[in-house]
Amino acid sequence: MTESDALAQVANLPGVPDAVDDARTAVDRLLGHRILRRRSAEVSTEAALRGARASAALEGSPVTLEELRGMESPADPVVHGALRVSAELGTLTETWRKAPRQVLARLHVLAAADAVDGAELGRPRTSDQPVQDALDLGEPPSPAEAARRLELLSNLLTAPTQAPALVVAAIVHGELLSLRPFGWGGGIVARAALRLTLV
């Protein structure tokens, strides 16, 4: 770890290494499960569907898995956006490592396509845009501050680090939730970025 590796410094804070080890142990147990290995495609599809449903629920859309499975095309823009994001995540992993801001813009386009004006899709918010705050996180940073911190986050993500992916993913998720760089769908984007960081 170098002094300039800020993510590794966070990974070495008290309690973090133990939490990472506990998470790895739990994941290793799942990876060792015979049935999960044998039916990995089916499990991946189900996990993506459940992830999209959970993301929509956190944004205030209480759709059940049964309802989601029965829908041809969801009318709720939150549910539809979460499903679109989940479906496209696999195609964004390589770009995420090189150009995270580009991927964040794409994730916002997918998440918010049915909810915001086309001119706002994929673009960070401006001073005159309201911010949807389903988690009641309080006042977001100003657009200028959000843009500055988004640039810093992008620089951290494209720099080499010794930090475990779990720590990097937690930082990405927390910072994007805090910044709410887009006026709508920020939670969906933050959770998708977390998943991309773990891949």
Q: What is each residue range found by the language model?
A:
Residues M1-V199:
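FIC/Doc superfamily catalytic core
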